[in-house]
Every structure is written in structure tokens, then in C-alpha cells.
UniProtKB/Swiss-Prot annotation:
EC number(s) per entry: 2.3.1.-
Entry GO MF terms: fatty acid elongase activity
Function: Catalyzes the first and rate-limiting reaction of the four reactions that constitute the long-chain fatty acids elongation cycle. Uses malonyl-CoA to add 2 carbons per cycle to the chain of long-chain fatty acids. Condensing enzyme required for the formation of isoheptadecanoate (C17iso), which plays critical roles in animal development and growth.
Localization terms from the record: Membrane
Extracellular side, ranges: 1-30, 91-111, 157-159, 224-230
Tissue specificity remark: Expressed in the gut, neurons, pharynx and muscles of the vulva.
Protein name per UniProt: Long chain fatty acid elongase 6
Residue ranges annotated as Cytoplasmic topological domain: 52-69, 133-135, 181-202, 252-274
Pathway: Lipid metabolism; fatty acid biosynthesis
Pfam entry (one): ELO
Native organism: Caenorhabditis elegans
Length: 274
């Protein structure tokens, strides 16, 4: 490793956790992460073409491990960032918890925030399971993966106050989502309404982020101190708007249009299994 570079294990094993080291590590890897995301797009569509005339792979075992691993990681991350955010609430106040970074990026919540950024590359693996098992690949899926990963890497070293809430909400929703996927992959019968509510939670986190961003934006234009930058602020706002539109459309197509065809089909499947 070239002199001056910070390794993953150096950040992981430094006690107490050093946010400055983690920022250096992400800064060193963000360009590689960007090119990985570009390669990801090429690979998934190339692989999709290759799989056109092939039978789907039976990946039950690997999928079980994958979903269980991400469910455990997301749950631990949710717990760590929940305690970190509660500390900010009680020590600095509700609004300050997203206006300024405080101590959130230090300690256990800081370590999991750093791991959160890195995990966005690992989550590309979700798409491989979709393609190799010949499940439908939606634009929403890969677009969301690519944009979230690049935003996470690019904005990490900027110390954005509102990223504390984004990280916490994403961890929390993912802990439930991957827990649901894990149960499904293990063959556990899960009520159809749970999938519907997970989509609702995903949309809700984007809506909450909008309120936070609007407040931070108001404070910024009125000359008050905020931990934000114009470039990353607009990147985040436009990204979140696109997510509300895409996830909202998915919700409409799945659970409202035609009386909720997807939802009703899943319920019928449940009855057949029972």
C-alpha cells in the first residue's frame, strides 16, 4: 500500500474509532467505487443477456446466507445509529441532530456509518441474485443502488448533518427489509401486507428526508449555520425526489392500480400454500 494511504483494517482496528481516518479511507476509495458502479451497470445487463436462454440457477443456500448477513448487519447498524442519534437528541436537541453533525460520526455510530457507506458496494450483490435466478429487474432497483452508493461515497467526507438521519433511517428500514427477504428465502410464510408496509416505510423515509432538507435549506438561505454544502444538498434533494417518484409509482402499480393486483396475487398464493 502506498505511503499515506489508510487501509480498511487500520480504520476498523483503531481505538477509539477515528472519523478522520474513515474520511481519508473513503476519499481514497470513492473513485474506485464510482468505476465499480459503472462496471456494475455493464455487467448486470450483459449477464441479463447471457441468461436469456438459460435456466435460472438454484441459489437458495447462498441467498439464505446473503440475506441473513445483510439482515444482521443492518440490525446492528440500526441499533448503533439509534443510540448515536438518541445521544444527539438528549445532548443537543432534536433539530440540532440533523443541522450539525455533533458526535454522531464518532464512536460506534461513526464506525457503522463508515461501514454503511462501504456496504453500498456490497449491496450490488442483490442484483446478481435477481439476474441469476431470472427474476424481473426493475429500473428502480439498479438506479437506486447506483445513485445511493455514489452519493454515500461522495458526501461522506463533507460531514453533512442530515446524513445522520439518512443513515439511521436506511439502516432501520433495511433491517426489516432484509429480515423479510431472509424469512422468504428460508421458505417461511410471510403475510403479503408486510411487503406492502416495507414499501410504505421506504417512501416514508424519503418524505422525512424532504422535510429535513427543506428545513436545512431554509436555515442556509437565511444565513444560519448548517453542516451542509450547496452541491451535496442539491444532489441529495434531487435524488430523494426521484426516489419518491419511483417508489411511489411502484407502490401505485403494485398495491393500488387495478385494485392492487400484485398484493391480491400474493394473498392468493398464501391461501394456496395454506
Amino acid at each position: 500500500m502506498p505511503q499515506g494511504e489508510v487501509s480498511f483494517f487500520e480504520v476498523l482496528t483503531t481505538a477509539p474509532f477515528s472519523h478522520e481516518l474513515s474520511k481519508k479511507h473513503i476519499a481514497q476509495t470513492q473513485y474506485a467505487a464510482f468505476w465499480i458502479s459503472m462496471a456494475y451497470v455493464v455487467v448486470i445487463f450483459g449477464l441479463k443477456a447471457v441468461m436469456t436462454n438459460r435456466k435460472p440457477f438454484d441459489l437458495t443456500g447462498p441467498l439464505n446466507l446473503w440475506n441473513a448477513g445483510l439482515a444482521i448487519f443492518s440490525t446492528l447498524g440500526s441499533l448503533a445509529t439509534t443510540f448515536g442519534l438518541l445521544h444527539e437528541f438528549f445532548s443537543r436537541g432534536f433539530f440540532e441532530s440533523y443541522i450539525h453533525i455533533g458526535d454522531f460520526y464518532n464512536g460506534l455510530s461513526g464506525m457503522f456509518t463508515w461501514l454503511f457507506v462501504l456496504s453500498k458496494v456490497a449491496e450490488f450483490g442483490d442484483t446478481l441474485f435477481i439476474i441469476l435466478r431470472k427474476k424481473p429487474l426493475m429500473f428502480l432497483h439498479w438506479y437506486h443502488h447506483v445513485l445511493t452508493m455514489n452519493y454515500a461515497f461522495m458526501s461522506f467526507e463533507a460531514n453533512l448533518g442530515f446524513n445522520t438521519w439518512i443513515t439511521w433511517m436506511n439502516f432501520s428500514v433495511h433491517s426489516i427489509m432484509y429480515g423479510y427477504y431472509m424469512l422468504r428465502s428460508f421458505g417461511v410464510k410471510v403475510p403479503a401486507w408486510i411487503a406492502k408496509n416495507i414499501t410504505t416505510m421506504q417512501i416514508l423515509q424519503f418524505v422525512i428526508t424532504h422535510f429535513i432538507l427543506f428545513h436545512v435549506g431554509y436555515l442556509a438561505v437565511t444565513g444560519q449555520s448548517v453542516d451542509s454544502t450547496p452541491g451535496y444538498y442539491w444532489f441529495c434533494l434531487l435524488m430523494e425526489i426521484s426516489y419518491v417518484v419511483l417508489f411511489g409509482n411502484f407502490y401505485y402499480q403494485s398495491y393500488i392500480k387495478g385494485g392492487g393486483k400484485k398484493f391480491n396475487a400474493e394473498k392468493k398464493t398464501e391461501k394456496k400454500i395454506e
